[in-house]
Structures are given as C-alpha cells and as structure tokens.
Amino acid sequence: MNDKITLVTAFFQLGRGEWNSFKRTNDDYFNYFDFWARIKNDMIIYTDKVSAQKIEEIRIKKYNRKNTKIIIIDDYRKIDEDLYNSIKSATENGFNTEFRINPSTPESWNYDYNYLMLLKEWCVKDSVEKGLAKGIIAWIDFGYNHGGKYYTKSQEFDFEWKWKFSDKIHLFTVNKLDDLPIFEIIRSVNSYIQGGVIVAPDKLWLKLWNLVRENMLTLNKVGFSDDDQTILLMTYRQNKELFELHESDSWFSVIADYSNQKFTIKKCNAKKKKQKLSKKLIVKYLIKWFSILNNIEIKW
C-alpha cells in the first residue's frame, strides 16, 4: 500500500461548555486542534458555519495548509434523521442512563453526542463519495491529544504523517479484548477500542459506515444507546476478517506508534487509570441500587 494518508476530522458545537461533567468549551477544542493542525497531510474538515471561520484561521491562515477542504453542514441532525431519532428515543427511555455505573458520562445521556460520534464514519465515507479523499484515509478526532495530554510539543506536528497500513480497517485498542457481553460493557463503561483514530482504505469506509449504523440501530431496538467505541467493538466482533487491531498504551499514541516522526511525549497508562476509576464507581453504583431495591414493595 502507498504510505500517503489523507486525514478527515469534524467539529460541531454541542454546548459542551455548559455540561455538569466532562465539560469542555468550544475554545478548548479550537486550542486542541491548534496543537496538531499544522500537520502537512491533506485534510477534510466537517463543521458548522459558526466554527468554519475559526478553523480556517488556524489551519489555513496560521499554518498555511492550503491542502485543506472545509465542508459546512447546516444541520448535522439532518444527515441521517432516522438514525438521530432512533438514538434519541433509546437515550431518553430512562433505563439507558440508570443502568450504568457512571450515568454522568456523555454516552449515557446525550443523544447528540452519541449520534455525532457515529458520524465519524459518515464523514469519511462522504469525503470518498465526493472525490475529496482516496487511498488510505484516517479519521482523527478534532480534539486529538487534548492540547498536550500525550504529545507535549506542538511544533513536532510540522510533518506529513506516512505509514504503510495494510488493506484492512485498522482499529487501536486501549485494553485487551475479551468476551464480556455488550450490555455489561455498557453498564460498566468499559473501553476497549478507541475512536480517536481509525484508518482504512477508501473502498472500506462505505462498508464500515453501513455496519456501524446497523449496529447502532440494533442496540437502540433493545433500549440502549452508546458512543462509537462500543459500536466499533460490536462491528469488529461480527466482521473480524475486515479488521486489523493494534494495541496502544495511550488514547493518543497512534501517530507516534505508526510514524517515523520523533515526538516528545508524556507517558500515560490508560489501563491502570481505568481500573482505579471503576472501583470507585462500582461502590457508588451498588449503593444506588441498594437504595432503590430497599424502596421496592415485593408481593409474593
């Protein structure tokens, strides 16, 4: 395979700065993007009218990356209204949120968030269909690296990311895969596959979009909704022949792991952090359900 990689990303304003938890402002995201936006690869960016000017200022005017195409979407909800309404209905049923150990996570309660996370594959598929991207294409989250969480020197992104990926869909894992049922993964908020970077040849992005869309709708039909990480895991389990998995020791290490560029990084063990967090959440979850069960009148 050719080592050239086209990048696709997206940013839509979700009002995340007003959330009670997992709060990040629009300016936070623009700063995150600014950290890696000088990368020299061809880039297609999907966004809304309000954000387009700021993105252009960063990518094109500040870093002079004219190999950039900005696609404006007036209303992201209208991209796939059936999918949006399905996710909304499942998210709002009450049980979808209460079922989880940590109901404050955005995938537990925010249907716009879950919908937008799934549109990653749609954006790349759309880029291919419009003739804007070909060959190996990588989705990369707009907020990749969170402004210095892993990579510490922005100037080290002044390079073109190249790597000879095979003719498969490449997913990157932060925890070892097991056979835990999907419902338990949703309940325990476990993470296996990261959604921040996905790499695949152009010919497989339409198939991937159709598969993740179908799996989200299937999950919605049984009363649940979740973000793209769980949906990607479902898709992998059903279609292993399409995929190649790669272990990562951080949510953001992919570009460092699969390029010849030298980066200055912070070491972060995602696995240990997740395990410590889960113990605290499990205790809270047990207390909550013990209280609920104590108030249920049982009739024999």
PLM ranges: what are they?
Residues 1-106, 115, 119, 127-133:
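N-terminal anchoring/stem segment of glycosyltransferases
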Residues 15-17, 52-55, 78-81, 145-150, ...:
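Short catalytic/ligand-binding loop motif for oxyanion handling, primarily in non-cytosolic enzymes
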Residues 146-150, 186-271:
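Catalytic core and acceptor-binding pocket of nucleotide-sugar-dependent glycosyltransferases
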Residues 169-182:
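Short beta-strand-to-loop element that shapes/binds the nucleotide-sugar donor at the catalytic cleft/hinge
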Residues 261-300:
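Membrane-proximal basic amphipathic "stem/tether" segments
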